[in-house]
Regions:
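Non-globular, low-confidence helical/coil segments that flank catalytic cores
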Residues: 2, 7, 19-370
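C-terminal segment of classical bacterial N-terminal signal peptides
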Residues: 12-20
Length: 370
């Protein structure tokens, strides 16, 4: 079965097609890709260079997710992945790498350093990862580092459990949302180690923080906001938890949630969105059973449905399972997948397009204070 799937993937995305196209746009194009509650985001710069942040799921989902990433690569017209950032070593962020690397060259591998959460499921993945970066360039990112991408200012603001100490230009004002924060008393995980990036293209600004935890978000944003504001927030943690101390001072005009059908979008997280000052829209990769109709966004802002579409979305949010009991398997979505495409201009204007229904919305450039 796997050989059949591999054949189909190669048939749809042959190397000659993947590398024949050359990028010729004057926009920064961002592809937020559906990897079923994992993460994969492709940045295609006007220079022709590309940055991929994470590679989706491993295991049975690896071929599926690699194919979805390659579809975005083809649309972007990039010839290789110049910089691959692995935010952290969880299977939904790095699992698809080995499969992807068989179909497209990857020039540089960027990560946070040593794994702090070894285990039987992730150790073989990291062994294969080490074999890949041994053949290319490997960089351990530190807060304050810059990734050289023509036309972009790409700053690392978090990595390896550390955060940026010096505010970005124009940032550094006191953050009024810090006072009410209560630290979460939990052991550190790979999420705490996440590589976080702040990207500037002319006057357009966006951020992607992987699964950076609330405690590390506090370290980054308090007592002073070291980042300033953004136009687009590519949400951390799949939209599972959204903190006022991060979202509110960033003051995004739009946000994209790379969630799954039962991952991201619980009521408390959605309430933070809906009360966020200046946030016009939230775009969701999937409708979320965790939010139900009660807390969801309009359907035109949702990219993906299920293999067996529902006649209606439940009104009430899905109740969590009893403590100590696992949730039942999530509904399947292994068929056609749609992504969000963002096209940003140097003046700060950007357009988000839902490729499922063709709906797009343009957010005009505007003067923004921190």
């Amino acid at each position: 079965m796997r050989m059949t799937m591999l054949f189909l993937l190669v048939a749809v995305f042959p190397a000659s097609v993947a590398f024949a196209q050359t990028r010729s746009a004057n926009t920064l194009d961002i592809y937020v890709i559906d990897v079923e509650g994992g993460n994969a985001v492709l940045f295609a710069a006007p220079s022709g260079e590309s940055v991929l942040v994470d590679t989706g799921n491993g295991g049975d989902g690896a071929v599926r997710d690699a194919g979805r990433i390659l579809a975005a690569v083809k649309d972007a017209g990039v010839q290789r992945i110049d910089h691959l950032i692995i935010t952290h070593y969880h299977n939904d962020h790095i699992g698809g790498l080995s499969e992807l690397a068989t179909h497209i060259p990857i020039k540089e591998f960027i990560d946070h350093g040593a794994n702090i959460q070894p285990g039987a499921n992730i150790d073989p993945v990291l062994e294969r990862y080490a074999g890949l970066y041994a053949k290319g360039k490997h960089t351990v990112a530190k807060p304050g580092d810059k990734i050289p991408v023509g036309g972009l200012d790409w700053r690392i603001v978090a990595s390896g459990g550390e955060v940026l100490k010096t505010p970005l230009p124009g940032a550094g004002r006191p953050n009024p949302y810090c006072a009410s924060f209560k630290a979460v008393d939990v052991a550190k995980t790979e999420d705490d180690e996440s590589v976080g990036s702040f990207i500037t293209f002319g006057k357009f600004r966006t951020i992607i923080l992987g699964d950076l935890t609330l405690n590390r978000q506090f370290d980054l944003m308090c007592p002073n906001n070291r980042l300033g504001s953004v136009d687009l927030d590519i949400l951390a943690r799949h939209g599972n938890v959204n903190s006022e101390l991060l979202l509110y001072p960033l003051h995004p005009r739009a946000a994209i949630m790379n969630n799954g059908t039962r991952k991201g979008g619980p009521p408390e997280a959605m309430k933070v969105f809906f009360s966020s000052p200046g946030l016009a829209d939230v775009w969701q990769m999937h409708f979320s059973l965790l939010s139900g109709q009660e807390y969801t966004v309009p359907g035109m802002f949702i990219a993906n449905l299920l293999d067996q579409p529902q006649t209606a979305m439940p009104v009430a949010p899905l109740a969590p399972p009893p403590q100590g009991q696992p949730a039942p398997p999530a509904p399947q979505h292994n068929g056609t997948a749609y992504y969000f495409k963002v096209s940003a201009q140097p003046d700060g204007t950007f357009t988000v397009t839902n490729t499922r229904n063709g709906f797009s919305k343009t957010y005009k450039a505007s003067a923004k204070a921190e």
